[in-house]
From Swiss-Prot:
Residues 160-172 have a biased composition (Basic residues). GO terms for biological process: adherens junction maintenance; brain morphogenesis; cell-cell adhesion mediated by cadherin; cerebral cortex development; establishment of protein localization to plasma membrane; homeostasis of number of cells; neuroepithelial cell differentiation; pore complex assembly. Homodimer. Interacts with F-actin, nectin and NECTIN3. Essential for the association of nectin and E-cadherin. Isoform 2/s-afadin does not interact with F-actin. Interacts with ZO-1 and occludin, but probably in an indirect manner. Interacts with RIT1, RIT2, NRXN1 and BCR. Interacts with ADAM10; the interaction locks ADAM10 at adherens junctions following ADAM10 recruitment to adherens junctions by TSPAN33. It comes from Mus musculus. It is found in: Cell junction, Adherens junction. Residues 426-492 form the FHA domain. Residues 1576-1587 have a biased composition (Acidic residues). Disruption phenotype: Mice show developmental defects at stages during and after gastrulation, including disorganization of the ectoderm, impaired migration of the mesoderm and loss of somites and other structures derived from both the ectoderm and mesoderm. Cell-cell adherens juntions and tight junctions are improperly organized in the ectoderm-derived cells. No redundancy exists in the function of afadin during gastrulation. This is Afadin. The modification N6-acetyllysine is found at K1803. Residues 653-908 form the Dilute domain. Residues 39-133, 246-348 form the Ras-associating domain. Residues 146-186, 1410-1446, 1523-1561, 1593-1665 form a coiled coil. It comes from the Eukaryota.
Length: 1820
C-alpha cells in the first residue's frame, strides 16, 4: 500500500476510535493507531462457571492484533489458573448482545469486534465458555420427580425408576429427539433459541449497571443516536421532492408478538412501502434477527369511537409489500372509523390481493407443476411469468431482429422494461385500468389493446378488436393464443416483448445444462444479450436466456465476502469470516430462485492446480507485449483467476480458511512474477508501459474487490511499488532517448548541419511516447505524470546549460530567441495532446529565462516588467543570467544597478517563497522533479469495458489449446467487471434505473426560457434523437460542460430538450444543422427548453449511454486497430504538412492509403461522420488493419459540443515509430463539430464532384486531394462569434460562389484565421509562413536576429498552434492547360470578369480593372503564347474539326480526372492575404457543404493581390482601412473581456492565466495602433520608441518573408504547370493521332463514294459546257463569272455568326471557354468569302465581309450552272467550311485573292484524279 493510502486509512481509523472514546467510559478508552495501524484498549470479559452456576468477570488490556485464540489463552489463566492441570477443555469466546450471541472465529480480533459496536452505539459483552461443559441439570431428580436437590456431588446418585417414571422418561426422550430433528431442519431457529437463552442468562445474572456497561452515558448517547437518525430521515424526506409533508410518524402495534409493549413509533415517508415498515418495526421491537418476509403489516379498521384493545367489529386487511402505510393512513377518512396498523406474522396461506382475482373459489392446489409448486399457491414475485421489452424507444420492431452488438460488447438496444403478469387478467393499452395493467403508447396501440390472462399455470393473449395489431412470433393473431416461454409478443408497430415463464424455464434447465431458448439473431459475443431488470418492489428478475446449471456457470456463487454486508459496511474489517459467510450464503441461496440473474463477471477462467505455475508463467513471464491485441489481457485473466480461486469451483473440498490462504498465495505469486518481468525488461520502453498499465489496473481490481481487498494488503503494497518502479524505469528510458536529441534546441540555423539532431527528433520522441502509452491503455493520470517528468527534464537540461556555462555565449538575445522558438514547438505539441497545463508548469523556468534574454533590460523602468515576467526565477538564477549576458555588437549593456535591483526584488519574492515551501535557493534546476508519485483514483478500464473485451479470447487461445485453462463466458451476466467491487450495489442500481422508467409520466414536459451569456462558449453537449411516437428529431442536452455558460446558469441539465435558439426552432433539424444554428448566435442567446424532455419521450436511457469518447474507446478496444478518421474529414488535407514551406512533400508511396470500402461499409462509415472525432496519437493505422466499420447497425445517436471545437488531423508515417507496438490506440475525449450532412451522400452528376470512393488510386485522405479545407481548432474560451465579422464572411463566401464556374484554381474555402491569445503565442507555430517574425518578439531590433529554424518533415504532424492562422493548402495537383501542347513558363493572364458568372456591373468593372492593371505583367507571356498559337493554328483547326461531335459532358470531368501519376505533389501556396485574412479571428467556422466545394476557385487577380511587385493602391487602401477597423474592434473585445475577468472575485487558475495573456495581447494591440497613428501623422518623423521599432521590424520581416515565399511558390507553380502541360500535350497528341487515323479512314470511304457519283455527273456537265461555249464567246466576260457558281439556295451567313466558335476540345469545357474569351483570334476560324461585284471594287464591307446581295447575281445562270451547283452541294456536306471556303475557289479566283494579299493556302486536299478533272474544267 502506498504511503498516501496508509495515511488515509490511519486517519479513518483514528476518527472511528475518537467516536468510541467520546461515548465510552474512560476505562475502555482506545489508544490512537500507530504507523502500522495497531491500537490498544481495555476489554471486559465474562466467564460462565457451569459448576458454580454464575458468571465471573475480568478486565484485560488487548491489542488490535491479538486474535481470539490469544485472548482465550490469557483468559484461561486469569479466570481459573488450575483449569488446564485438571482437564483439557475447549474454550470459545462469544459476543453477546441483548438480541443474541455469536461465537467469534479463532482468527478474529476481539478489540476490532468491540470497536465495530460503534456503528449503532451498541452495547455488548464478551463471554468465555467451556464447550465441554454439559447443560447444568438444575432440575435433576433425586427421590421423586418433584424433588430437587442442590447441585453438587449428590447429583450423580442414581436410583431405580418406577414404570411410570420410565414411561414418562421415554416420552420425553422421543420429544427431545423430535425437537432435535426439527432443529436440524431449522438451524437458524435453533441457533436463535440457543443464542437467546445464553443472552438471557448473561443479562439476568449480570444486569445492566454502570459496572457492566461500556457506554459512559447511555441516555445521552441513545438520544443523540435517535436525533441523528431522525435528522437523516428528515433530510431524505426533503431531498425527495422538497415538500415538508412527505414524511411523518406512524404507530405500529404488535399485540401478538410483544403484548407487554403497547406500540412503537416509526418514521416513514409517504413513499415508504410496507416491507420497509416491517423491517423498521422489527428493529424497533428488538427482532432485527427475524426474517422480514415472515412478517407483515395489517391495517385494522375499528368502528368510530372504539378503543384499540376492543377488537369487536374490527376488520383486518394485510397490506401488500408495495403499499404505502403512511399514505394510506393520511388518506383514510375519519368518518369511516379508526385505522391502526398491526405487526404480525405472515399467515402461511396468505395470497396477495393482486393474485386473488382468479384464485377465489378454486382449489388452492392449482395445476400441479413439474417443480411441485402450483400457481394457486402464493408464488414469490420472481416466479411469476413476465414480459421483457426488446425494443424500447424504437420506431419499429425490426430493431430486435437485427440488433447489433458493438465492438465494446454493448447491445444496440436500451435497458428493457419488465412487466410481471399476476394471477389475473392484465390489460394492455393506452389507458391505465388499474395498477396491474400495462400502459403503452405508440402507433397501432388501442386504448384497450388486448388482455393477458395468467390462470392455472397457462398464460394467454387475447386481442380486444380486429384493429388491435398483436403478433406472436411474427404471426398476427385475432383470437386467444397460448404463450410459451421464449415467445416474442408484439403490440402495434413499435413494442416488442419477450414472454418468459421462470417455472417453465426451471423445468427445462433441469433437462439441459445450457438448453435455453436464445434470442434469435446474430450472436456476436457471449454475454451480449442482456435482459436483466429490476421491478419496483425490489425483486430481481431475468429476461435473458435460460439459466445454465450452477455447476458450470456460477463459479462465484459461493464467493467470499463479509457476512451481512449491509450491516458491516463502513466497519473495520481486518479479517473476513469465511465459514459464517458461506453458511449464510448457503441458507440464503435456498430461498433464491435459480432463474434470477447471475451477478457474476462476464466470464470466468478455470485452471488445474497442477498447472497453476505454468499458467501464471505463461500469462506473465512469456507474454510478448508487442503482439498482444488487447493490452490489458493479463490483468483481466489474472483477476478472473483470483475470483476462481475464491469460488467453490476451485477445490470445493477445502475449508474457507484454506481457500483464503490459497487466494493470498496465488496473488502473491502473480505479484512476484510481475516484479521479475519488470526488472528484466527495465530498459525496454514498450514492455515497461505495458506492465505499468497492467500492474496499475490489477491493483485497482484487487483494491476495489470487496473480498480480495482485505486479504491481500501486502500484495497491494508490492503492486503499488511495482507501478512506481515501472514508471521510474520508463521515465529513465524516455529521458535517455530525449537526451540524445536535446542538442537540437541549441542548433544554430546558420550552421545547417545534416548530422546534428533537429527539433523534429524531439517531437518524434514525445509523440512515440504518447502513442505507446495510449496503445497500452495507460491511465491518463499516469500519462500526465510521465510527461510532466519529460517536460521537467527538457526544462532542467536547457536551463542548467544556460546558467552553468557562461563561456558558451548562450546567454544572449540571439540564443534566447532560438531556444524560445524551439520551445514553442514543444508547447504546440503539448497543447495538441492536451498536456498544455503540464508543459506550461514544468517548462516555465526555461521559458521565463529565454524571455528574460530577449526582453528589454536596459533602463530602470524595465525592472518591474522583468520581475513580473520572470517570477519563477530566484535571485541566483536571475543574477547568473544577467551577469553572463552577451550583448550584441550594437546592443546596449545591462546596467549593474539594474541587475542588483532585479536580484534584490527576487530575494524578497521568489527566494522567500521557495524557503517557505521548504526548498533551497539554488542556481541549477534539480534533475528530479520534486513531486510525489500518485496512483490514480479513477479512470481505469473496468469502468468502461463491458462483456468480454475483443482480443481477450485470442490472448487465451494458445493457453486453452495446451490445456492450461478454460474460459467460460457467462451469457447471463450483467456484463460489468465491477460486480464484486466494494459498494457496487448493482441490484439497487438497476432497480432504481427501471423504477425511473416505469414511473408514470406527465403528458407534457415543463417549458422554460433560458437566457445565457456566452463568455467561454455555451458549454453544452447535444444529441439528436427521436422518441417513440415522435415524427421529428429532437435536440437534447447530453451533458453540460463544467464551467460553461450553461453550467454557470444552472437551469439546464442532461435530458432537457432544446426547442428553439433565439426564436429559431430546432425541432426536426438534424444534429449538425442545430449545432450550426447554436454556434451562429450572439454573445447572449435565448433558449426555449422542455425540461427533462428526453424522459418524457422515452429517451431516458439515452442519458446513460457512454459519451463519444467512451464509444471510441470501445471501438478501438474492440477491434484492436485504429479507427479510420471520420468520413466527414476525408476532404481535408493536413495543411500543416504539405501547406507550409517547412514541410516538403514526400513521395506518393510514403503515404498510407486506406483500403477501398465496400458499399455497405462505406454507408455505415458515412453514418458515423458526425460523431465526435477524438484526436488520436497521430500514428499510422496498423499494417493490414481495417477499421471497425463493418456492415451492421451503426450508432445513430451522436453528440456535438457547441463549447468545444477541435481539429482533426492525420499525419503521414514515413519514419518508424520510436516505441513500436503495432496495435491498439487509445483516444482522448474531444467534442468536434460534425462535417456537413451532405457528405453522407454522393454528389449528383451535374455537381462535377469527383467520386473519391470509386477511384481506388485516389488517396482520399492524403495530401494530394484537390480540395484542401482547413478546419480550425478553437479552444472553448475562443468559441465566441462577433456580429461585426458576420458580414465580412458572407462577402468572402459570395465572392467564392461567383467563381464557382471557373476552375483555374481549386483552393481552400472558409479558412478561419484565429487570433492569438497572447503576444508570446505569436511566435512559436510551425505553421507560420513568416519565419523571420518568429524571432523578433522583443528588443530594439538593432542587433542580429537568427534566421528561421524550420523543422524538417517528420513522421508525426507538426506542432500546430490553434491560436494562429493556418497555412494555405497546396493547389490541386491536376491543372488543365488552356492550350494543347503549349508549354507554359509563366501563369496565363487571368480570365475576364464576364467569365466568372453572373455578377453585378460594379463587381464586373472591378474585375476588369484588375485585369488591366495586371495585363502588363503578362505581356511577354501573352506575346509568346500568340506566336505558339500561330504556329499551331492549322494543326488545331484540323483537330477541332474532327471533334465537333465528340464534345464531352462537363459532368464527366473532375479535378482529379487527369491525375495519372501524382508522384510529386505541388507545394505551391497562394498568398495568405487573399482569403484567410478576410475571415476574422473570432469568426465561427461554418459547416462546409459539398456543394460549396465544387470548383471553388481563386482568380489570379486575387492570387497576386498580395504581390508587392504589382500593388493595387485602391485595394491596399481599402484593406488597410478594414484592418484598422478590425484592430480597433479586437482591442475593444479584449478590453471587455479583461474587464469581465478583472471584476471576477474568485478567478480560477485558468482564468488568471488567460487574463495575463489577454493583458499582453491588449498592450501589443494598443502599441500597434499607436505606431500606425504616428506613421499617419508624420511619415518623416523618426520614432524612437523601442516597442514601435520592434513592431515595424516584425511587420517588415513578415512582408519580406511573404514576398520570398510568394516568389518561390510562383516559381514552383510554373514548374509544375510546365510539367503538367507536357504530360497533357503528349496525351492529347496521342488522342489526336488516333482520331486522325479514324477520320482518314472515314474520309477515304466517303470520297470514294463521292467520286463515283461525280464521274457520272461530269460527262453530262461536259456536254452542256460544249453547248454553251459558242454563246459564252459572244458575251462580254465579267470577272465574277470566272468563279464556281454558288448554289441556288445559298444564303450568306450573317455578321453575328462571324466568330463561329469551333467546338470545344476534349478537355474541360471551362478551360476551353476561358481560352476562347481570353484570345478570340487564338484559334482558326473559317473565313466565308462572298465574292461579287462589290468585292471587286473593295467596298466598305472589306474582303472578309459578308454581303447579302450575292444572291441577286445567280439567277441568270441557272441552266449552264446546274451541274456545278450539284457538285457544290455534294461537297458542302463534307467540308468543314461553307461553299465560299478557299478550297472551293477556282485557280483564277485564288490568283486574284493572292494578288490582293489574302490567304488562300488552306485547302482540303482531294484525290489527284479529282484535282485533274477540276483543273480541266476550269481551263475550258
Amino acid at each position: 500500500m502506498s504511503a498516501g493510502g496508509r495515511d488515509e486509512e490511519r486517519r479513518k481509523l483514528a476518527d472511528i476510535i475518537h467516536h468510541w472514546n467520546a461515548n465510552r467510559l474512560d476505562l475502555f478508552e482506545i489508544s490512537q493507531p500507530t504507523e502500522d495501524l495497531e491500537f490498544h484498549g481495555v476489554m471486559r470479559f465474562y466467564f460462565q462457571d457451569k459448576a458454580a452456576g454464575n458468571f465471573a468477570t475480568k478486565c484485560i488490556r488487548v491489542s488490535s492484533t491479538a486474535t481470539t485464540q490469544d485472548v482465550i489463552e490469557t483468559l484461561a489463566e486469569k479466570f481459573r489458573p488450575d483449569m488446564r492441570m485438571l482437564s483439557s477443555p475447549k474454550y470459545s469466546l462469544y459476543e453477546v448482545h441483548v438480541s443474541g450471541e455469536r461465537r467469534l472465529d479463532i482468527d478474529e480480533k476481539p478489540l476490532v469486534v468491540q470497536l465495530n459496536w460503534n456503528k449503532d452505539d451498541r452495547e455488548g459483552r464478551f463471554v468465555l465458555k467451556n464447550e465441554n461443559d454439559a447443560i447444568p441439570a438444575k432440575k435433576a431428580q433425586s427421590n421423586g420427580p418433584e424433588k430437587q436437590e442442590k447441585e453438587g456431588v449428590i447429583q450423580n446418585f442414581k436410583r431405580t425408576l418406577s414404570k411410570k417414571e420410565k414411561k414418562e422418561k421415554k416420552k420425553k426422550e422421543k420429544e427431545a429427539l423430535r425437537q432435535a430433528s426439527d432443529k436440524e431442519e431449522r438451524p437458524s431457529q435453533g441457533d436463535d433459541s440457543e443464542n437467546s437463552r445464553l443472552a438471557a442468562e448473561v443479562y439476568k445474572d449480570m444486569p445492566e449497571t454502570s459496572f457492566t456497561r461500556t457506554i459512559s452515558n447511555p441516555e445521552v448517547v441513545m438520544k443523540r443516536r435517535r436525533q441523528q437518525k431522525l435528522e437523516k430521515r428528515m433530510q431524505e424526506f426533503r431531498s425527495s421532492d422538497g415538500r415538508p409533508d412527505s414524511g411523518g410518524t406512524l404507530r405500529i402495534y404488535a399485540d401478538s408478538l410483544k403484548p407487554n409493549i403497547p406500540y412503537k413509533t416509526i418514521l416513514l415517508s409517504t413513499t415508504d412501502t410496507a416491507d420497509f415498515a416491517v423491517a423498521e418495526s422489527l428493529e424497533k421491537y428488538g427482532l432485527e434477527k427475524e426474517n422480514p418476509k415472515d412478517y407483515c403489516i395489517a391495517r385494522v379498521m375499528l368502528p368510530p369511537g372504539a378503543q384499540h384493545s376492543d377488537e369487536r367489529g374490527a376488520k383486518e386487511i394485510i397490506l401488500d409489500d408495495d403499499e404505502c402505510p403512511l399514505q394510506i393512513f393520511r388518506e383514510w377518512p375519519s368518518d369511516k372509523g379508526i385505522l391502526v396498523f398491526q405487526l404480525k406474522r405472515r399467515p402461511p396461506d396468505y395470497i396477495p390481493k393482486k393474485m386473488k382475482k382468479h384464485v377465489e373459489g378454486k382449489s388452492l392446489k392449482g395445476k400441479d407443476r413439474a417443480d411441485g409448486s402450483g400457481y394457486g399457491s402464493a408464488l414469490p414475485p420472481e416466479k411469476l411469468p413476465y414480459l421483457v421489452e426488446l425494443s424500447p424507444g424504437r420506431r419499429n420492431h425490426f430493431a430486435y431482429y437485427s440488433y447489433h452488438t458493438y465492438e465494446d460488447g454493448s447491445d444496440s438496444r436500451d435497458k428493457p422494461k419488465l412487466y410481471r403478469l399476476q394471477l389475473s387478467v392484465t390489460e394492455v393499452g393506452t389507458e391505465k385500468f388499474d395498477d396491474n395493467s400495462i400502459q403503452l403508447f405508440g402507433p397501432g396501440i388501442q386504448p384497450h389493446h388486448c388482455d393477458l390472462t395468467n390462470m392455472d399455470g397457462v398464460v394467454t393473449v387475447t386481442p380486444r378488436s380486429m384493429d388491435a395489431e398483436t403478433y406472436v412470433d411474427g404471426q398476427r393473431i385475432s383470437e386467444t393464443t397460448m404463450l410459451q416461454s421464449g415467445m416474442r409478443l408484439q403490440f402495434g408497430t413499435s413494442h416488442v416483448f419477450k414472454f418468459v415463464d421462470p417455472i417453465q424455464d426451471h423445468v427445462l434447465s433441469k433437462r439441459s445444462v445450457d438448453g435455453g431458448l436464445m434470442v434469435k439473431g446474430p450472436r456476436h459475443k457471449p454475454g451480449a444479450v442482456q435482459e436483466t431488470t429490476f421491478e419496483l418492489g425490489g425483486d430481481v428478475h431475468s429476461g435473458t436466456a435460460l439459466p445454465a446449471s450452477r455447476s458450470t456457470t456460477r463459479l462465484d456463487s459461493d464467493r467470499v465476502s463479509s457476512a451481512s454486508s449491509t450491516a458491516e459496511r463502513g466497519m473495520v474489517k481486518p479479517m473476513i469470516r469465511l465459514d459464517q459467510e458461506q453458511e449464510y450464503r448457503r441458507r440464503e441461496n435456498r430461498t433464491q430462485d435459480a432463474t434470477g440473474p447471475e451477478l457474476i463477471l462476464p466470464a470466468s477462467i478455470e485452471f488445474r492446480e497442477s498447472s497453476e505455475d505454468s499458467f501464471l508463467s505463461a500469462i506473465i513471464n512469456y507474454t510478448n507485449s508487442s503482439t498482444v491485441h488487447f493490452k490489458l489481457s493479463p490483468t483481466y485473466v489474472l483477476y478472473m483467476a483470483c475470483r476462481y480461486v475464491l469460488s467453490s469451483q476451485h477445490r470445493p473440498d477445502i475449508s474457507p480458511t484454506e481457500r483464503t490462504h490459497k487466494a493470498i498465495a496465488v496473488v502473491n505469486k502473480m505479484v512476484s512474477m510481475m516484479e521479475g518481468v519488470i526488472q528484466k525488461q527495465k530498459n525496454i520502453a514498450g514492455a515497461l508501459a505495458f506492465w505499468m498499465a497492467n500492474a496499475s489496473e490489477l491493483l485497482n481490481f484487487i483494491k476495489q474487490d470487496r473480498d480480495l481487498s482485505r486479504i491481500t494488503l501486502d500484495a497491494q503494497d508490492v503492486l503499488a511499488h511495482l507501478v512506481q518502479m515501472a514508471f521510474k524505469y520508463l521515465v529513465h528510458c524516455l529521458q535517455s532517448e530525449l537526451n540524445n536529441y536535446m542538442p537540437a534546441f541549441l542548433d544554430d540555423p546558420e550552421e545547417n548541419s545534416l548530422q546534428r539532431p533537429k527539433i523534429d527528433d524531439v517531437l518524434h520522441t514525445l509523440t512515440g511516447a504518447m502513442s505507446l502509452l495510449r496503445r497500452c491503455r495507460v491511465n491518463a493520470a499516469l500519462t500526465i505524470q510521465l510527461f510532466s517528468q519529460l517536460f521537467h527534464f527538457i526544462n532542467m537540461w536547457l536551463f542548467n546549460r544556460l546558467v552553468t556555462d557562461p563561456d558558451s555565449g548562450l546567454c544572449s538575445h540571439y540564443w534566447g530567441a532560438i531556444i524560445r522558438q524551439q520551445l514553442g514547438h514543444i508547447e504546440a505539441w503539448a497543447e495538441k495532446q492536451g498536456l498544455e497545463l503540464a508543459a506550461d508548469c514544468h517548462l516555465s523556468r526555461i521559458v521565463q529565462a529565454t524571455t528574460l534574454l530577449t526582453m528589454d533590460k536596459y533602463v530602470p523602468d524595465d525592472i518591474p516588467n522583468i520581475n513580473s515576467t520572470c517570477f519563477k526565477l530566484n535571485s541566483l538564477q536571475l543574477q547568473a543570467l544577467l551577469q553572463n549576458y552577451h550583448c550584441a555588437p550594437d546592443e546596449p549593456f545591462i546596467p549593474t544597478d539594474l541587475i542588483e535591483n532585479v536580484v534584490a526584488v527576487a530575494e524578497n519574492t521568489a527566494d522567500e517563497l521557495a524557503r517557505s515551501d521548504g526548498r533551497d535557493v539554488q542556481l541549477e534546476e534539480d534533475p528530479d522533479l520534486q513531486l510525489p508519485f500518485l496512483l490514480p483514483e479513477d479512470g481505469y478500464s473496468c469502468d468502461v469495458v463491458r462483456n468480454i473485451p475483443n482480443g481477450l479470447q485470442e490472448f487465451l487461445d494458445p493457453l486453452c489449446q495446451r490445456g492450461f485453462c478454460r474460459l467460460v463466458p457467462h451469457t447471463r451476466s450483467p456484463g460489468t467487471w465491477t460486480i464484486y467491487f466494494e459498494g457496487a450495489d448493482y441490484e439497487s442500481h438497476l432497480m432504481r434505473e427501471n423504477a425511473e422508467l416505469a414511473q408514470p409520466l406527465r403528458k407534457e414536459p415543463e417549458i422554460i426560457t433560458v437566457t445565457l451569456k456566452k463568455q467561454n462558449g455555451m458549454g453544452l453537449s447535444i444529441v439528436a434523437a427521436k422518441g417513440a411516437g415522435q415524427d421529428k428529431l429532437g435536440i437534447y442536452v447530453k451533458s453540460v460542460v463544467k464551467g460553461g455558460a450553461a453550467d454557470v446558469d444552472g437551469r439546464l441539465a442532461a435530458g432537457d430538450q432544446l426547442l428553439s435558439v433565439d426564436g429559431r426552432s430546432l425541432v426536426g433539424l438534424s444534429q449538425e444543422r442545430a449545432a450550426e444554428l447554436m454556434t451562429r448566435t450572439s454573445s447572449v442567446v435565448t433558449l426555449e427548453v422542455a425540461k427533462q424532455g428526453a424522459i418524457y419521450h422515452g429517451l431516458a436511457t439515452l442519458l446513460n449511454q457512454p459519451s463519444p469518447m467512451m464509444q471510441r474507446i470501445s471501438d478501438r478496444r474492440g477491434s484492436g486497430k485504429p479507427r479510420p478518421k471520420s468520413e466527414g474529414f476525408e476532404l481535408y488535407n493536413n495543411s500543416a504538412q504539405n501547406g507550409s514551406p517547412e514541410s516538403p512533400q514526400m513521395p506518393w508511396t510514403e503515404y498510407s492509403e486506406p483500403k477501398k470500402l465496400p458499399g455497405d461499409d462505406r454507408l455505415m462509415k458515412n453514418r458515423a461522420d458526425h460523431r465526435s472525432s477524438p484526436n488520436v496519437a497521430n500514428q499510422p493505422p496498423s499494417p493490414g488493419g481495417k477499421g471497425p466499420y463493418t456492415s451492421g447497425t451503426a450508432a445513430k445517436i451522436t453528440s456535438v459540443s457547441t463549447g468545444n471545437l477541435c481539429t482533426e488531423e492525420q499525419s503521414p508515417p514515413p519514419r518508424p515509430e520510436a516505441y513500436p507496438i503495432p496495435t491498439q490506440t487509445y483516444t482522448r475525449e474531444y467534442f468536434t463539430f460534425p462535417a456537413s450532412k451532405s457528405q453522407d451522400r454522393m454528389a449528383p452528376p451535374q455537381s462535377q464532384w469527383p467520386n473519391y470512393e470509386e477511384k481506388p488510386h485516389v488517396h482520399t485522405e492524403s495530401n494530394h486531394s484537390s480540395i484542401a479545407i482547413q478546419r480550425v481548432t478553437r479552444s472553448q474560451e475562443e468559441l465566441r462569434e462577433e456580429k461585426v465579422y458576420q458580414l465580412e464572411r458572407h462577402r468572402v463566401e459570395a465572392g467564392m460562389d461567383r467563381k464557382c464556374d471557373s476552375d483555374m484554381w481549386i483552393n481552400q474555402s472558409s479558412s478561419v484565421e484565429s487570433s492569438t491569445s497572447s503576444q508570446e503565442h505569436l511566435n512559436h507555430s510551425s505553421k507560420s509562413v513568416t519565419p523571420a517574425s518568429t524571432l523578433t518578439k522583443s528588443g530594439p531590433g538593432r542587433w542580429k536576429t537568427p534566421a528561421a529554424v524550420l523543422p524538417t518533415p517528420v513522421a508525426v504532424s507538426q506542432p500546430i498552434r490553434t491560436d494562429l492562422p493556418p497555412p494555405p493548402p497546396p493547389p490541386p495537383v491536376h491543372y488543365t492547360s488552356e492550350f494543347d501542347g503549349i508549354p507554359m513558363d509563366l501563369p496565363l493572364p487571368p480570365p475576364p470578369a464576364n467569365q466568372a458568372g453572373p455578377q453585378s456591373a460594379q463587381v464586373a468593372a472591378a474585375e476588369w480593372k484588375k485585369r488591366e492593371e495586371h495585363q502588363r505583367w503578362y505581356e511577354k507571356e501573352k506575346a509568346r503564347l500568340e506566336e505558339e498559337r500561330e504556329r499551331k493554328r492549322r494543326e488545331q483547326e484540323r483537330k477541332l474539326g474532327q471533334m465537333r461531335s465528340q464534345t464531352l459532358n462537363p459532368a464527366s470531368f473532375s479535378p482529379l480526372a487527369t491525375q495519372a501519376k501524382p508522384e510529386k505533389p505541388s507545394t505551391l501556396q497562394r498568398p495568405q492575404e487573399t482569403v484567410i485574412r478576410e475571415l476574422q479571428p473570432q469568426q465561427q467556422p461554418r459547416t462546409i457543404e459539398r456543394k460549396d466545394l465544387q470548383y471553388i476557385t481563386i482568380s489570379k487577380e486575387e492570387l497576386s493581390s498580395g504581390d508587392s511587385l504589382s500593388p493595387d493602391p485602391w485595394k491596399r487602401d481599402a484593406r488597410e482601412k478594414l484592418e484598422k477597423q478590425q484592430q480597433m474592434h479586437i482591442v475593444d473585445m479584449l478590453s471587455k473581456e479583461i474587464h469581465e475577468l478583472q471584476n471576477k472575485v474568485d478567478r480560477t487558475a485558468e482564468e488568471s492565466d488567460r487574463l495575463r495573456k489577454l493583458m499582453l495581447e491588449w498592450q501589443f494591440q494598443k502599441r500597434l495602433q499607436e505606431s500606425k497613428q504616428k506613421d499617419e501623422d508624420d511619415d518623416e518623423e523618426e520614432d524612437d520608441d523601442v516597442d514601435t521599432m520592434l513592431i515595424m521590424q516584425r511587420l517588415e520581416a513578415e512582408r519580406r518573408a511573404r514576398m520570398q515565399d510568394e516568389e518561390r511558390r510562383r516559381q514552383q507553380q510554373l514548374e509544375e504547370m510546365r510539367k503538367r502541360e507536357a504530360e497533357d500535350r503528349v496525351r492529347q497528341e496521342e488522342d489526336g493521332r488516333h482520331q486522325e487515323e479514324e477520320r482518314v479512314k472515314r474520309d477515304a470511304e466517303e470520297k470514294r463514294r463521292q467520286e463515283e457519283g461525280y464521274y457520272s455527273r461530269l460527262e453530262a456537265e461536259r456536254r452542256r459546257q460544249h453547248e454553251e461555249a459558242a454563246r459564252r464567246l459572244l458575251e462580254p466576260e465579267e470577272p465574277g463569272l470566272s468563279r464556281p457558281p454558288l448554289p441556288r439556295d445559298y444564303e450568306p451567313p450573317s455578321l453575328s455568326s462571324a466568330p463561329c466558335a469551333p467546338p470545344p476540345p476534349p478537355q474541360r469545357n471551362a478551360s476551353y471557354l476561358k481560352t476562347q474569351v481570353l484570345s478570340p483570334d487564338s484559334l482558326f476560324t473559317a473565313k466565308f468569302v462572298a465574292y461579287d461585284e462589290e468585292e471587286e471594287d473593295y467596298g466598305p464591307a472589306g474582303p472578309n465581309s459578308y454581303s447579302g446581295s450575292a444572291g441577286t447575281a445567280v439567277g441568270a445562270y441557272d441552266a449552264p450552272r446546274e451541274a456545278r451547283e450539284k457538285l457544290t452541294r455534294s461537297q458542302d456536306a463534307d467540308l468543314p467550311g461553307s461553299s465560299g471556303a478557299p478550297e472551293n475557289l477556282t485557280f483564277k479566283e485564288r490568283q486574284r485573292l493572292f494578288s490582293q494579299g489574302q490567304d488562300v493556302s488552306d485547302k482540303v486536299k482531294a484525290s489527284r484524279k479529282l484535282t485533274e478533272l477540276e483543273n480541266e474544267l476550269n481551263t475550258k
